Structures are given as C-alpha cells and as structure tokens.
Amino acid sequence: MANIERVIGREVLDSRGNPTVEADVWLDDGSFGRAAVPSGASTGSREAVELRDGGGRYNGKGVRTAVENVNTTIREALQGGSADDQAALDRQLIDLDGSPNKDRLGANAILAVSMAVAQAAARSRGLPLYRHLQQEGSAAQLPAPMMNILNGGEHADNSVDIQEFMIMPIGFDRFSEALRCGAEIFHALKKVLHERGLSTAVGDEGGFAPDLPSNEAALEAIIEAIQRAGYQAGDQVALALDVASSELYRDGRYHLASEGRDFDAAGFADYLAQLVDKYPIVSIEDGMDESDWDGWKVLTERLGGQIQLVGDDLFVTNPQILQQGIDRGIANSILIKLNQIGTVTETLEAIRMADEAGYTSVVSHRSGETEDVAIADLAVATRATQIKTGSLCRSDRVAKYNQLLRIEQELGDDARYVGRDALRPEQG
C-alpha cells in the first residue's frame, strides 16, 4: 500500500499558448506521477467547469486560482491518504469540491491531481499506465486513429463550416502500419493543396486549414490525397467528420455560412446523409446541436443503422447524460474527454456504460493539448475502439501516436490492432 506524500500544482502552457494546470504527486514509496490538463475550443455547455482567473493576465485565461486549490485544499485533503483506490480518491475529490459541475475547485485542478495519482500508483505497482487502468482479465487492444488532417470551424481561420475532416486507416493489421498510412496521406494532401495554390498552414490540431468553397471541396481534396498516396478510399481508409453542429446552430436552424445555406434538423440530417451516400464516411460526430435532442433522434433514425454517430457536446463524457441518450435511443457512440467530466473514475464509468449499451467509445484529445500522453494509455486500457488525437504534425498530437507505437512494441505478438472492428459489427 502506497500513500500520498506530496502534491504540487503549477501553471504551464498548452499548445495554444494558454495556461493550464499541471500536477505532480509523490508517494511514500518514492513513486512519482505527473499530469497536465488539456483545454477545448468548442466546448459543450454541460462540461465540468475549467476554472480561469479572468482579468488582464494571460487575457483572462490564467489558472492561478485552480493551481492554488491544488496546493492548498486538495493537497491538505489527500496528503497521507492511499493512492491504491482510484475510485475512492476521485470520490474524495468530488465531495471536496461539492458542486455539481466542479466549479468550486475547478475540473482542471481536480483532473490534474486525479491523473497524476493514477500515474504514481501505476509506477508504484511497477506497471505502465495502460496495465494499471486495465480491467483484470481483459486483453490490450490498439485503437483505430481518427486523424484530423483538414480543419475548419472553430479550429481554423477559414471558410469551411465542418470543424474536422478525418481519415481512419482501418484496413491494416498493425497500428504502426495504419499510422504510416495516415502520415503518407497527410503529406500527399499537402502537395494537393500546394498545387492548387492553397494554404498549407495548419490549425490547432495540426490539420491543414485551406480556404475552400464548400465542405464537399474539402472531402474531394482528401479523396485525391488518399489515392495519390497509393491507398484505397473506403476499403483501406475511411472518412469521419466532426460537424460541431452547436457552432452552426442559431434560431433553431443549422447555418452553413460558406455555402449560404441553412436547414432545419430534418433538412440537415438529409444534407449529412447525402454526404454519407457520396463519400466513404463511417462516422459523424456532433451531427446535431447539443440541445437539439429531437434533431438527434431524427439523425439517429436516419443514419444510426448505417454509420457511427458520436456524441461529444451532446454527452460531455457524463455518465448521467449518456444514460439519458441510451434511454432515448440517441447516437450510438460517445466521445471520451477526461476534462469534460474531471476525474479518471468518472471517465472509466462513462466508457463502461457505453460498452454495456453497445455504444462505441472514442477517446479524444482537446484542441488545446499538452505533452501528456495519458489518453493513449487510456484508449488501450479500456479497449476503446478509436482514438482521436489530431493530425500527423505538431508534437502535442504526435506524442500520443508515439506512445501508442511504444505500447505496440511492448505488447509484441499480443498487440492487436482493432482495424475494421473499430466500428459496430453491423457497419462492417
């Protein structure tokens, strides 16, 4: 049994140059854990609260208050306590905060400590994090990556409405081969855009952000890049979208500014269905606004038996909200973001609940990331079938892919890449 000896919080910078919380935890057996918390650009209104200082410092985005909470209230409560029971520790943190959305201490403060304790406890047991978090008796599995190679919406300063255009290299036997495929397509897309005289600057998540006339133009460019790289769109490489519809939703309608069009929920479901019919799209995230549950029902009835429909802003990694969606037959997949809910235990609970309901889980980064690679371990530990962690450039994104390569090597012959099984059986 290892007890918590010391907890320290600090303010560090994320990949967008904004402050975030990092925590260090030492146990009395000498084990050490460190974790840094990411931050989103398009956020769900029901996410756990990320505590920011306001004022002029760092344009109001400082996290000194959250760090102070780590170094006082949280440290005093945890010091001397056991690190062996993650669920009990996280419950203590939740109770210590006492609010329904962690707005007293800050989800960024709570999560940094929750993750750092998990890291320290893993080292205390002599295990990598994915083994420490893994359910007893379950086999490790490498997830299929959703690679965001073209950005629009809130993740880029361009005219494309859909926030993320992703490739999923599913037709491969090993994660390392899937990663190579993604990297080659990324470089092919850069050439395609350069030849058209378009920008090859990248957005927050490392994807290109060209000024294209429509969402279909973005899809066509990606299809061309897949073919130029020598791969088959659909068979080897599928497409996925993050529509981030909450950013498009105003006055009860969905607005595509780049195309000068707007739709009601049924019309927008039709628009997305047309894209699915025309392109090898196997997954759509946030296809409707987070508050438009009737629209989600329409979309699920229209496309839920055909493709994966992922709830991000809809579910915000919250088991209670997910249960409502399951009960109402809305979506068939959940995006998993640690900082949306604020503790390791609640995140694991959301994945377990999704799995029991037949929903897939997609473990995800945020647009404001750090060098922390814990989500790679989380995806492997929970057998989440997919991971979404950006493009094939920017160290904050590539760090997660590199961690998955290390895990694959460590697992050796036991390293199973999920490939086409990433999607529900009825989707192939």
Curated annotation (Swiss-Prot):
Gene Ontology BP, a term: glycolytic process
Compartments, record wording: Cytoplasm; Secreted; Cell surface
Family: Belongs to the enolase family.
Top-tier EC class: lyase
InterPro entries: Enolase, Enolase-like_C_sf, Enolase-like_N, Enolase_C, Enolase_CS, Enolase_N
Catalytic function, reaction form: (2R)-2-phosphoglycerate = phosphoenolpyruvate + H2O
Oligomeric form and interacting partners: Component of the RNA degradosome, a multiprotein complex involved in RNA processing and mRNA degradation.
Cofactor note: Binds a second Mg(2+) ion via substrate during catalysis.
Named cofactor requirement(s): Mg(2+)
Keywords recorded for this protein, A-Z: Cytoplasm, Glycolysis, Lyase, Magnesium, Metal-binding, Secreted
Listed Gene3D superfamilies: Enolase-like C-terminal domain, Enolase-like, N-terminal domain
Binding positions for Mg(2+) per the UniProt entry: 242, 285, 312
Pathway it works in: Carbohydrate degradation; glycolysis; pyruvate from D-glyceraldehyde 3-phosphate: step 4/5
Primary location group: cytoplasm
Annotated S-S bridges: none
UniProt-listed HAMAP family: Enolase
A Pfam family: Enolase_C
EC number of this enzyme: 4.2.1.11
Name by which UniProt lists this protein: Enolase
